[in-house]
Amino acid sequence: MTGSKTALIMAGGTGGHIFPGLAVAEALRARGWRVHWLGAPASMEARIAAQHGFALESVTFSGVRGKGLATLALLPLRLLRAFWQARAVLRRVQPDVLVGLGGYISFPGALMGLLRRKPLVLHEQNAVAGLANRLLAGRADRVFAAFPGAFGSAAPKARWVGNPLRAAFTQQAGPAERFAARTGPLQLLVMGGSLGARALNELVPQALALLPAAQRPQVLHQSGATQIEALRAHYAAAGVQAELRPFIDDVACALAAADVIVCRAGASTVSEIAAVGAAALFVPLPSAVDDHQTRNARWLVDAGGGWLLPQHELSPRGLAQMLSNLERPALLDKALKAHAMQKTSATQELVGACEELAA
């Protein structure tokens, strides 16, 4: 497509919504589309949209599930403000298609778009559809899901396509090729998701300290932007050397370089691990709405592509024992089984739907 159509990407809150949105936004731009991003000001999506050259259209709104009574009491006023702001964005941008990728920020924009008879494409990243997507699914023109059955009865005709991924995740060498040249200590990657994970930041250094120095893996540990100093203190207290970063820009290369990963089970993380083909121990976020991280991880673990450990069962001694027993042949087997579960057509499916609806 070479026409100058306009898309409004609606995704925010966490990397699990934002990075699939980024994959679709970049693919649309490469096809000649003008792309705007609906998000909250001073947010993760605002920062990432700016980094990648997308215009941010601001709407002030926040999630309500799991919040207190005071937040719920203010919901009508906050919704009215968000609807008014979204209406102004739509009048200014005049999008040909709206693309909603979940997160609370997508709801006011999508609803105002439907009232203006704008085509709506929805994608759900998690194994259990979020509230915004469930409410919108019956009115959307196209509905896609990263995991089978994510929408349940809310959208029985939703197409299972996997998660939109940036090209870097599908361009890595396969697991067999990567593992063939590896020798020496295992490479351990620890990721807590885009917001970090305090439990992993505290427990992993303690576990590594229980291993003899000669048996310790080489470690790359992503802390989350606000937890890097605390993470440095944990490793210093444990007497363990590691490469520590608040955020990993090239996640695809980091996944490909790892022999084993300890991580949360956000939708993007699970899909990216499958696309690259890597062995992972998933420790789902216990406070995730609808326990969707456990469901995300279960999809890959049930296929033999990793391990699942609830956070309340995670301990330094147990993790140390697991790490001490790992060998590359078994890790390669897990990586191959994870890789066999990859679904990498989602970006193209969503772009195709946008072009069809805007024609």
Swiss-Prot record:
Pathway: Cell wall biogenesis; peptidoglycan biosynthesis. GO terms for biological process: carbohydrate metabolic process; cell division; cell wall organization; lipid glycosylation; peptidoglycan biosynthetic process; regulation of cell shape. The gene is murG. Its EC number is 2.4.1.227. This is UDP-N-acetylglucosamine--N-acetylmuramyl-(pentapeptide) pyrophosphoryl-undecaprenol N-acetylglucosamine transferase. Keywords: Cell cycle, Cell division, Cell inner membrane, Cell membrane, Cell shape, Cell wall biogenesis/degradation, Glycosyltransferase, Membrane, Peptidoglycan synthesis, Transferase. It comes from the Bacteria. GO terms for cellular component: plasma membrane. Belongs to the glycosyltransferase 28 family. MurG subfamily. Signal peptide: none annotated. It catalyses: di-trans,octa-cis-undecaprenyl diphospho-N-acetyl-alpha-D-muramoyl-L-alanyl-D-glutamyl-meso-2,6-diaminopimeloyl-D-alanyl-D-alanine + UDP-N-acetyl-alpha-D-glucosamine = di-trans,octa-cis-undecaprenyl diphospho-[N-acetyl-alpha-D-glucosaminyl-(1->4)]-N-acetyl-alpha-D-muramoyl-L-alanyl-D-glutamyl-meso-2,6-diaminopimeloyl-D-alanyl-D-alanine + UDP + H(+).
